[in-house]
Amino acid sequence: MQPDLHCRTLAAHTLKHFRALSPLTHCMTNDVVQTFTANTLLALGASPAMVIDPAEARPFAAIANALLVNVGTLTASRADAMRAAVESAYDAKTPWTLDPVAVGALEFRRRFCLDLLSLRPAAIRGNASEILALAGMALGGRGVDTTEAALAALPAAQALARQIDCIVVVTGEIDYVTNGQRTLSIPGGDPLMTRIVGTGCALSAVVAASCALPGAALDNVASACCWMKLAGQAAAERSEGPGSFIPAFLDALYHLDVEAANATN
């Protein structure tokens, strides 16, 4: 099953709807990327909320437009809060997204993520090694993102998408987005995106927010990947290194005009 190239015209249309809706996105993410994730969502036009206490996470997940669960700095108490939020989201039919950070290397988070899959995520976003591990096809590894690695993990992503009935994103130099039947590829970005902490985690938050939009979930999630790739390219052109890249990236998201980018490429 060969992937199709995602259409930037559709990404431009989806971004207009995203900014109009400004989805309230409940981010249960890791401690390292809280601020960057919130700023990424704000720059694109979404409304982030970082609610983590179990007593608050359960009711808040029911009123949010979308939920992100990122296990990067997972603890036992945080796992309890995340499960409570996911159960609430499931009952309320709030779409939720799983980011299974380092799931192949650590047993506690692997078991936790596998257990959560029964509560039907709308989307899963990970690098090649994470998707392979979650699909039960490989364990361990650092999860280095390369075009070859992401493409090699695509069959696992497609199988996982069919098994869970969700969208699976494998990120790398080229991102692959699949529902198990149809697969889209999103090239672009810049190597500087891998030289700062949080671009993948922030993408997961944008993917989660995009799942709140009406229409085809596959196209909405692929559009989210496209926005981040385009912003990364634009920011790299204005940056001298990782330190200047971060503010340039947020500015690029804020000023993102997919139609203009489409016309110049």
Swiss-Prot record:
Name under which the protein is recorded: Hydroxyethylthiazole kinase
What CDD domains does UniProt report for this protein, alphabetically?
THZ_kinase (cd01170)
Supply the alphabetized keyword list: ATP-binding, Kinase, Magnesium, Metal-binding, Nucleotide-binding, Thiamine biosynthesis, Transferase
What species does this protein belong to? Salmonella arizonae (strain ATCC BAA-731 / CDC346-86 / RSK2980)
Pathway it acts in?
Cofactor biosynthesis; thiamine diphosphate biosynthesis; 4-methyl-5-(2-phosphoethyl)-thiazole from 5-(2-hydroxyethyl)-4-methylthiazole: step 1/1
Report the family membership.
Belongs to the Thz kinase family.
Q: What EC numbers are recorded for this enzyme? A: 2.7.1.50
The record ties this protein, via InterPro entries, to:
Hyethyz_kinase, Ribokinase-like
Lineage summary: Bacteria, Pseudomonadati, Pseudomonadota, Gammaproteobacteria, Enterobacterales
